[in-house]
């Protein structure tokens, strides 16, 4: 009886001290070890791909989408080359490189877009917008296409520069879309 009680207690303790990680298709989970007693903590360098993995209760995880992600940015009061205030809806599509999500989380954190991409992207777009007149920004598709290409190139260069200075940023720029300008409602 004592052996059975000990065995049941051991099994219950083992089950209670574990959690499961189950990323869906198109996702990777990054394990973050936080041992209470033994072992070393930090980001596990091997991502958990689609399926199931059991971890210690003290281990947390971050789910990272491996599909292209769209980040919409609304630019209010962007200035054209004649200081006309215009509003824009823009979008950058980024994709985390396969099996490199642990590097992303380790180097830039769970909020990597907000931490290192968002403001730089907005500033680059504003810079290009200020080179053109309101008519071109509202109706000339060729101008908007040239801005898309230039912003994409500049963002790729920015990510490469960040990777050299602060550790790899394993993200690819899939596409940039600058919508046509809308007259600012305040004017």
Task: Give short role names for the model-derived ranges.
Residues 1-6:
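Bacterial N-terminal signal peptides that target proteins for export
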Residues 7-12:
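Hydrophobic helical h-region of N-terminal Sec-dependent signal peptides
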Residues 79-82, 87-88, 93, 113-186:
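Amphipathic, coiled-coil-like alpha-helical scaffolding segments used for oligomerization/assembly
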Residues 19-127:
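Hydrophobic membrane-anchoring helix/hairpin
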């Amino acid at each position: 009886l004592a052996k059975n009680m000990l065995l049941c207690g051991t099994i219950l303790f083992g089950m209670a001290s574990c959690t499961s990680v189950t990323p869906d298709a198109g996702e990777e989970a990054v394990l973050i070890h936080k041992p209470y007693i033994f072992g070393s903590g930090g980001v596990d360098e091997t991502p958990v791909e689609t399926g199931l993995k059991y971890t210690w209760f003290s281990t947390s995880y971050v789910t990272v989408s491996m599909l292209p992600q769209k980040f919409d940015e609304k630019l209010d009061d962007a200035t054209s080359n004649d200081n006309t205030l215009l509003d824009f809806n823009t979008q950058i599509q980024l994709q985390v490189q396969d099996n490199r999500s642990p590097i992303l989380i380790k180097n830039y954190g769970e909020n990597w877009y907000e931490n290192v991409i968002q403001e730089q992207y907005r500033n680059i777009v504003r810079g290009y917008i200020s080179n053109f007149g309101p008519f071109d920004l509202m109706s000339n598709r060729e101008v908007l296409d040239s801005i898309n290409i230039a912003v994409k190139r500049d963002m790729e260069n920015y990510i490469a520069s960040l990777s050299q200075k602060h550790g790899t940023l394993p993200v690819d720029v899939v596409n940039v879309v600058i919508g046509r300008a809308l007259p600012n409602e305040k004017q």
